[in-house]
Design a protein with these regions (language model features):
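A short beta-strand motif that forms the metal-chelation/ATP-contact edge
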Residues: 6, 158-161, 211-213, 279-293
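Phosphate-binding site of ATP-dependent enzymes
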Residues: 24, 155-249
């Protein structure tokens, strides 16, 4: 029976998690990785009165308890989104396993990256912006709802975003939405009544900034497209034209980011900022954000910083 000291919860195909596992192996630090898409191939029993979970994976047995578990890397969405392409049985299985993973917060003595309760709270866009203001960071003028405020000007451009990350399925194809630039007149002509949206001040010209926070470490990068700032949502651009340039944040912005992370109880977060007219604006924080591409493109040692936290002696 193997007592698990370091637990990694991810998916079979996840390059970010692969980097962490390789780093832990390089250090000779033992861990157990369990993948959500393989859970029905594992034998798992949580014994409540013993506060212990027993797993059998490929013939090997493992034990997880608050006495021995020291760190957990949790790279998975907090909630499962249903798809029309899934059978009723698959929907039931995935929903129940998702709930089971959320219940692993019973192992509350370990160091989590991130604790699911903190992730759930931090995914709320309105709360993020409120937290940023309390932390002393600027935010774009923001309105949330299904009505266009009277202050919106017809001839001015605004950014429109979803309040939650929407995932759509059309003929078995998964689709996402990005931020969209719209004039005030276009907003008034649209059918906002059907669902709430975020309407924000359009920042231009701007430079997009991605700051990856891991504990006390910050890895900030400026994002350029063909060596210039980007109009609108940089994620819509051809990846081959994007470059990520490391830089140093002002100390007050660093302090504000740490306050946001501490306020939500996050150990890891992907923070988006915008630099416009020499002012730094907080856009959002993603507690389950991608980061592996920054190891290759910006040379950031993010996986090593995460491994440092996971490697509890």
């Amino acid at each position: 029976m193997n007592d698990v000291k370091c637990l990694i919860i991810s998916s079979t195909i996840d390059y970010s998690t692969d980097l962490i596992c390789c780093e832990l192996e390089r250090r000779g630090y033992r861990y157990l990785r369990i993948n959500r898409d393989l859970f029905d191939q594992y034998e798992i029993v949580y014994i409540l009165d013993q506060q212990t979970m027993k797993l059998r994976i490929e013939g090997r047995e493992y034990t997880i308890s608050n006495k021995t578990l020291k760190s957990v890397y949790f790279r998975a969405p907090v909630f499962f989104r249903y798809s029309k392409e899934l059978s009723l049985n698959d929907q039931l299985k995935r929903g129940q396993w998702s709930s089971f993973i959320r219940n692993l917060i019973v192992f509350d003595q370990a160091k989590w990256i991130n604790y699911p309760v903190a992730t759930y709270k931090a995914e709320k866009k309105m709360l993020q912006l409120q937290m940023a203001m309390k932390a002393g960071l600027k935010i774009p003028h923001t309105y949330v709802g299904n009505q266009v405020p009277s202050i919106i000007k017809d001839n001015k451009t605004y950014i429109v975003k979803a309040l939650d990350t929407p995932v759509f399925y059309d003929e078995a194809q998964e689709m996402f939405t990005y931020s969209t630039a719209m004039t005030g007149r276009e907003l008034r002509d649209s059918e906002l009544q059907e669902a709430p949206v975020i309407i924000q001040e359009y920042l231009t010209p701007k430079v997009d900034l991605r700051v990856t926070a891991v504990g006390t470490h910050l890895f900030p990068a400026k994002i350029y497209y063909n060596e210039a700032g980007i109009e609108g949502d940089w994620r819509k651009r051809d990846k081959d034209g994007l470059t990520y340039i490391p830089f140093k944040l002002p100390s007050n912005i660093e302090a504000g980011i740490h306050k946001i992370m501490d306020g939500f109880g996050l150990v890891f977060g992907g923070i988006d900022l915008a630099l416009c007219d020499d002012e730094y604006y907080f856009i959002e924080v993603n507690p389950t954000g991608e980061w592996a591409w920054l190891v290759r493109t910006a040379g950031f040692q993010i996986h090593k910083a995460i491994a440092d936290i996971m490697e509890v002696i």
